[in-house]
Amino acid sequence: MKKLLLAASIICLASAGLAEENPTPVISNSDTEIKLEGFYLFENGYVKQDHLILFDKNVTDNRKKLGFYTEAAFAATIAKTINDVIAGAKIVLQPTTRAKTSTNYNGSHIFIETSYGKVELGSPADASAKLRITGSQVTAGTGGWSRYALLDGQYMRYNGLKSDFDTNASFYLESYSNSFDQINDKAERARRLNFFTPKMKGFQAGVSYTPDTANTGGNRDINNLTLASSGRNGVSVSKTGIKTVKLENNETMTINQNIRDAFSAGLTYEHEISEDADLKLSVTGEYGKPARRLIHAKMDGTTIQVLNTYKLSNLKAYNLGAVFTYGNFSCGASYGNLGKSLTAKEYYKVGRDTYYYNGAVAYGQGPIKTSLEYLKTSRYKNTVDAVSLATEYKIMPGLLPYAEISHFQAKGKPVYYPEAPSKTTRGTVGLIGTKLKF
């Protein structure tokens, strides 16, 4: 804890040194505008968790309980206006740390905007992600406790197989994508076509089309297979949305949860009830077909023998969300259901349904904001409960030091073994960091 307090002191001193007005840089002339924006996060995390074995206790390669985390984004938006038509491009650069992939930055894409709406070509963020409302949108801090917790450690496994858990409110089009774990991958999320209507009497709608969630726009080997002459049932070596699990007797299950012909849509409504009260509502959804089948195979030396293939169910997911603000108080809530999306009974024997709900309340007074959030997820009957208390202080516009403490509990077992005992792990994560946005 002394080390955590020391790190907090260093962060506060660094924040104070940056405390001066720093508006977003904008270069413009009569019809062309260039906007530069960026984000950087430095965070120190401390975790205490039970039932961790050997190196599972390490937050980093050589340190237990304590670790640093950084995240960054930098983007340039160039727009030109001619006869009430705005056309331009947004270019997001790859930083030398983990890239921030939130919908606020939305990745590199071309856009065209008129009075009839906005079209985005090649955007990595779909309409459901941009229009979705969750309770965490009103909170302080980052909600990043899951970066330091280990929910699928050795204690939680059975026959070497990990349990599946969800630690946030996300849909498949977002969660099954390249995660920038390697900064040299030079790949983003799948590319999409988006259309958003203009806001009319508080309403706005959006729709997206994604031909293939494995097509990130920069990758070349779209259909690279490891099995010769295996056709559509082959095992793709792409990392995007694919995992292979080892079973008994040298058998494996390769689960490709990529989607083809994926559609997502959303509808939001904003209403100013009074001078001090605002209400925002949102309904979003996703639909798509599985790109490939689940493959049951057996390893015989260097040879792979396909024993059987199984059809995965279609992607069908929706989210309902609301945010209410009254004066300095804000509260948000959401419920999401993914049903049996992209599962098959031959592997998901414990359960196939996934859902989540979360709620948060926040109070802001001047530069200080404090929030309390609760998250509940259930993925294939494996549950996660988390409560987070966070506070942040705005030193200047865009500069936010914060502190956050979260308590979590995960309970479950591997989906392939219904006979496995259900195990539980609990822990507490403390975060201290600084966010800088310009």
Curated annotation (Swiss-Prot):
InterPro entries in the cross-refs: Gram_neg_porin_domain, Porin_dom_sf
Keywords: Signal
Keyword Chaperone in annotation: no
GO CC annotations, alphabetized: membrane
First and last residue of the signal peptide: 1-19
GO molecular function, one term: porin activity
Protein's UniProt name: Uncharacterized protein RC0098
Species of the source: Rickettsia conorii (strain ATCC VR-613 / Malish 7)
